[in-house]
Structures are given as C-alpha cells and as structure tokens.
Amino acid sequence: MEIRVANKYALGKKLGSGSFGDIYVAKDIVTMEEFAVKLESTRSKHPQLLYESKLYKILGGGIGVPKVYWYGIEGDFTIMVLDLLGPSLEDLFTLCNRKFSLKTVRMTADQMLNRIEYVHSKNFIHRDIKPDNFLIGRGKKVTLIHIIDFGLAKKYRDSRSHTSYPYKEGKNLTGTARYASINTHLGIEQSRRDDIEALGYVLMYFLRGSLPWQGLKAISKKDKYDKIMEKKISTSVEVLCRNASFEFVTYLNYCRSLRFEDRPDYTYLRRLLKDLFIREGFTYDFLFDWTCVYASEKDKKKMLENKNRFDQTADQEGRDQRNN
C-alpha cells in the first residue's frame, strides 16, 4: 500500500535514522520529482522538527541551504518535506578511504565556511558542525555543498540590535564532542567562534584521517567527554597540524583567540586558505577526490560546464554576506 504525505508525495525507501526521527525519499505523484521527508513521532519527548522547520524558513533562499516544501502533522507524525540531497562529506570521506587531499580539503573548506557565515548572518549559530551535516547536491548541484540539521541551532544575538546574548558558564555540551571547541567542553555558552573552531577540527580530520582524541576508552558518556576534552587541551595546535600547511595552525590559533562576542573575520580565513591554494598551484575546478568515484560521467560534464557559474555565485555570496 502506497503511503502519501500531504496527498502529494509518495513515501519511498528509508534513507536513515537519527536521534530525532527517520528520513525517507519521496516522489511528487504528479511530477515524479524526488524529495527528502523527515518524520518525527508526535509522541517524541524532545520534539524538534517544528523548530527546525522555522529555522529553514529563516534561512530560506541561502546558497547551499535545503528548501522546505511542506511541513505539517499527519496521523502520529510531524513531517517535513525538503530538497533531496546527495551523500554527506562523512560518506564521501569513507568512500575515499578516509583521507582527503589538500586540494579537496581547501575547496571543501571554502564552501563550508560560506555556509557557516550565512547561518551566522541570520543571527544563529549551528552548534553541531561535523562532516555528517554537510551534503553535496544532486544533478546540476553535485558540486555544491549544503549545510543541514538545524535542530541544535541557537540564536546568539538580537535580530534588530545585533547585540550578543549574554556570556554564560556551566552549560552542558551541545553538539558532537569530537569536533566541539575547547570552550564548549569547558561549559561556556557557544557563540560564532565555536562553529569556526569546530570547522578547523573537521578540516584536520579530513587531512589526517582521524583526530588524536578519537577511540578513547571510557566508562561513561561523561567520562568520554572529559577524556576528549583533556586530550584536546593537551594537544597543541602545532602537534595537531603536524605535516599540514602552516595556514591550518594560523586558522586554529585565530579561532582560539576570539572572544565570546567577536565576529570572526571570515574574509581573512578565506584569504588564508586561498593563499595556500595559490601557493600549491591548485586549480579551483570543483573536481573533488570523490568526483571520479561518485559522480557519473554526465555529472562530471555538468561540473565542468557549470564551473564559471559557481565561481560567480561564490563571489556574489561573499559580497552579500560581507554586507550583513
């Protein structure tokens, strides 16, 4: 028996599960276009789909932000229909034998930083920056990296005055411990600096293949978090970035130097990574390590055909966000 959502979308195979519900693929019964559908039980103790749908509405229209087509309650489920995307960077990392080249890390970093800056420009911080929450697109958008999962996102400043909400301590860790900033481990209220620092750990994860605080033995969740924090604090940036270009040391030291209310200099960080790109003689051709493995010949052709369009979009995106 076919299950329909909003009498418009036919529910298909299950794509995955999270702590907050399940994700399915669905087809528009008229156009046959595919979408992603998130289902959350109306009996959930910690519902978040309503909150997340509101976030997507606020972020709507941003480059690399999925579009929501329908939200509502049917039967025992709260449902959200949104763009169907490709695999996550974590999936692609595994596909590439858990190591990305410097070129791929640099091209990936550029887009991820742009997505984070856009979220910040809308007065929110993500609070769960990790490879699983960045997905490539499909078809013509196969080279475009999208940011997803805003269930843990939080407003960090007043929308009108842009005054930061107050500094607090004694907070529980929100997000993924592997990539969490040191201040997050210390229980300090998160701000923009923490998303940027988390991205730095993601980039080193991609370059190294793993992080020094992975695989630690612990008897409880709290014990594990404590051990990750201790290892993270005791591992100097220079040791963490050993065998990586000095720009990554500069990046992380900059992140750790930011004060709670500081606006990160996204342009400086982009330029830092751009200088590395130029010095290494790379070409920004949108050919990632996973391109030959994942993309079809048709998709690869589209990537090359659309290179100039994406270059122009990225330039415009940077200008737009600097005006916020």
UniProtKB/Swiss-Prot annotation:
The record gives the effect of mutating N133A as: Severe decrease in catalytic activity. 80-fold decrease in affinity for ATP
Principal location listed in the UniProt entry:
cytoplasm
UniProt xrefs under PANTHER family: CASEIN KINASE-RELATED
Q: Which organism is it from?
A: Plasmodium falciparum (isolate Dd2)
Q: Which residues form the Protein kinase domain?
A: 9-278
How does the annotation summarize its subunit structure? Interacts with rhoptry protein RON3; the interaction is direct. Interacts with CK2alpha; the interaction is direct. Interacts with nucleosome assembly protein NAPL. Interacts with RAB5b. Interacts with host GAPVD1. Interacts with host SNX22.
Q: State the UniProt keywords alphabetically.
A: ATP-binding, Cytoplasm, Cytoplasmic vesicle, Kinase, Magnesium, Metal-binding, Nucleotide-binding, Secreted, Serine/threonine-protein kinase, Transferase
Q: What is this protein called?
A: Casein kinase I
Note the SUPFAM superfamilies from the entry: Protein kinase-like (PK-like)
